[in-house]
Amino acid sequence: MTAIVNAYIHIGFVEQISALCSDLLNKGYKKPLLLCDNVGGCAKVSRMKAVDTYGASPVSGLCGAAHLCRETSLPNVVFTDAGGTSFDVGVITDGSITHYDLYPTIDRWRTQVTAIKITSIGAGGGSVAWLNPLLGNRLEVGPASAGAMPGPACYDLGGEHATVTDADVVLGYINPDYFLGGKMRLNKEKAVKSLRELGKKTGWDEVTTALMIKKVIDAKMGQEIFKEVALKGYEPSEFTVFAGGGAGPTHCCGLASAAEMKRIIVPPISAVAGAYGASTLDIVHTYEKSRNTRLFDYAKGTYFTDFEMFNSIVNELRELAIRDVILEGFREDQATFRLELEMRYGMQWRYTPVESPLLFIHSTEDVKRVCDRFTEEFSRMYSAEAAFPQGGIEIETYRLFVYLNLPHFPITVHEVMGESSPKQALKGQRDMFWEKLNGFKRTDVYQWDMLRAGNVIEGPAIIEADNTTVVIEPGWTSTMTQQLYGILSHNI
């Protein structure tokens, strides 16, 4: 099925990439064109299969988030990207991305293209609010989206349905005169009209309807975050939310609260997290081979001893990798390798991907180290009580990653100067609705690019940037780091 899916999307892929290459060449670009893939790397167009690019944008965003969070010593982060239509979630643990989807579904088709695990749901700024008649006219938000055209009602491009963005405008969070840095004016009256129309059957006015939309979408996104972290065996409260996407910073406090998380990171590249992430990628190729290998026999109490067989499989994959490294124009000594093994206890149907501590094995002690790494990872995910050593320990798939480092822009570190007051960035005030404060309150509005390292902003407050709006709800505090990231903390 993987080959069929790849063949089906290959034609459109080639047409678009060929047009892009021609356009770049005509504009004087002479260097190779690199494309992002769904395993967190990039490669030349000539070395890329169409199916390997599926979902590459959110994967790039996740990789960019991991890069930024390592700079701020935040090891456990849940990456989120709330755009106009979808809400993407990925998990970073100990500063690394280790969770993969071994059989990702493309449209309705199950494929065998290993990809970094990203979960997406229909939730974003363009998500349409509606009343579900099957549930007594209960308010639902999404998965349908107004898209960019006609978009939310406030875009004034023909859209009539109330969306999350319309709710944010009516609640005062988004300034209609400063959307996209003032490049696009929003029509608040159209937003009010759409919300009133939606609230007719429930008896809500436009403000109540807007508040209910916010609560539903925040809960929906927060539940998805909680589920993704908890089902991987982690404690959600130990994670920091990375608020990405144009709508992410606007709803970050609400969704973090719903996910029981008390810290958020909002970098200045939030709205373009995927594009930024692409600039942080190195060239990565993946090679794999299925071969059942029993590493530990519980009944006999013996470990695997055919070291030559194990090493020959790894060597076979390594030779393929070196071939591609040379074809990419690099030397063999510029490449680094990482071996991942899909392992399980005997008679289990589910495999656990484990990073091998060794590329090759030469002794029983080496085999034991690999088995111990599997036991450690399995116990972390499912608890030690779920371990089943009586079934023995097996490898089903060998997967080799090869990395070629590319130059990247360094992250600028600013000196903390002066007092923590952000008064130099205060641009005004406007009325905003805060449920915890029981209504509309006059609220400070700050300009993002005027903030300095060390500035502290107590909620409620708003930080406006050209491509997003950061909503700091009551009970939250934002502190600007030396990298000029906003770190929002919940005041307990």
Regions found by a protein language model. Give the residues of each.
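Gly/Ser/Thr-rich active-site cleft segment
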Residues: 1-58, 149-198
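N-terminal glycine/serine-rich phosphate-binding loop of ATP-dependent small-molecule kinases
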Residues: 4, 15-54, 72-76, 93-101, ...
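Short, contiguous clusters of charged residues that form electrostatic/catalytic patches at enzyme active sites
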Residues: 15-18, 22, 60-63, 67, ...
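Glycine-rich phosphate-binding loop of actin/hexokinase-like ATP-binding domains
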Residues: 45, 49-56, 60-172, 253-295
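Short, flexible loop segments at the rims of nucleotide/cofactor-binding pockets, characterized by
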Residues: 55, 242-243
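C-terminal, non-catalytic interaction/recognition modules in large multi-subunit enzymes and RNPs
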Residues: 74, 84, 124, 136, ...
